[in-house]
Amino acid sequence: MAYKNSWLQAVREGRQRFAAGIDIGSQHVRLVVVSQRARGALHLEHMSTVPLAAGAMAGAEIVDRQAVARALRDAFAGLPRVCATHALRCAMAVPSSATLTTTVPLARLAAQSDCEAEDGGVALAGLAPAVMGEAERIAGLERHALAVDWYVDEMPSPVRSVKIAATARQHLEARIECAATAGISLSAIDGEPHAALRALRHAASRELDPNEPYAAVWVGTDGVYGWSVVDGSNVGEMRYPAPEHADLADALRDLLQGPEFDCALIGGEIDLLDGVGFSLADIGDVLGCSALPFECALLGSHARELDDALLHEPAGAVAFGLALRGVLE
C-alpha cells in the first residue's frame, strides 16, 4: 500500500516544527523563520529585515521600546499563513556586551555545595547556590538583579568544568516586554555569539566535508569572535578587542593552535571590519585558508519565493542560529 501524501506518512515523518529567530541589531530587526520535520530537510519559510528608528538602541540597551515593538510587528506582518497557523517557537538574542561569562572547575563548585563532582542530573541542582555566587562575583550585581544560565561542559577535558553566563535581568525583561507588546511570546533568549556559532556550524555541516577542520568567525557590533572546530568540537576560541591582542590579526592567530584549516566561515556584519582596516580576504590570509561568507540561502530548501536581502547576507547568522535552535530543541 502506498502512503504517499497520506496522513499516515505525515505521522511517520513526524510533526513539522516552526521556529523564528529574532535579531535586534543597532539599526535593524532581522527575522528568520524555518521549519523542519523530525527526519526531514530544513525549510526556509520567511525572512524580513526592518529598519529601526534612529536612537531606538544604545548599545545593548533598548531605549525606545515602542519603536522596537513596532519594528517587530512589521517584521512579522508578512508571515505566511502556514507559519501563522502553527505553533511558532520564537527566540531572541542578547548582545554579548551585555553578557558576562566564566568557566569554573566543577570540583570547586561541588566543594562549596552539597553534591559530589561526579554526580549528575538532579544532584547537580545542589550547585545552583555556588553558581549564583560566581555570577554575582563576575557581574558585580546581586542575584535578584541577574539572569543566569549554566551547564556542565561535557567536552573532553582533563578537568570537568561549569560554564556560567550572566546578564542584567533588565536586558531580558526589556526584550520580553517589546516582544509581548508586538504580540510575540518568546520561548528562549540566547547570546548573540552562541546563536551565530550554531548557524556557522550548521553551514559547515552542509558545505564542508565531514571532519574537515575549519574556523568559524562572527563579526558583531561589539567585536569579532572566532572558534576553531576540529572533528565537530570547538577546540579554541578568540575575541577581539581584548587586552592581550594588539590587533585583529594577532587575535585570529589564537585559532592556529591545531590542524591547518581548509576553510573559514564568516558571519555577521562584515562591513564593520572596515573600521579596523580588515576584510574577508584578510581573515583568510591570516588563517591560511579560503574565507567564505555565511548565506542562509544555501542552508535549506525554500518553501516559497523569498526576496529579502537577508537571504544572502552574512548578517543573517544570528537570526538563523536562533531559529535553528527552535526546531532542534
Task: Label the predicted regions.
Residues 1-329:
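Hydrophobic/aromatic-enriched cytosolic interaction surfaces used to assemble or bind macromolecules
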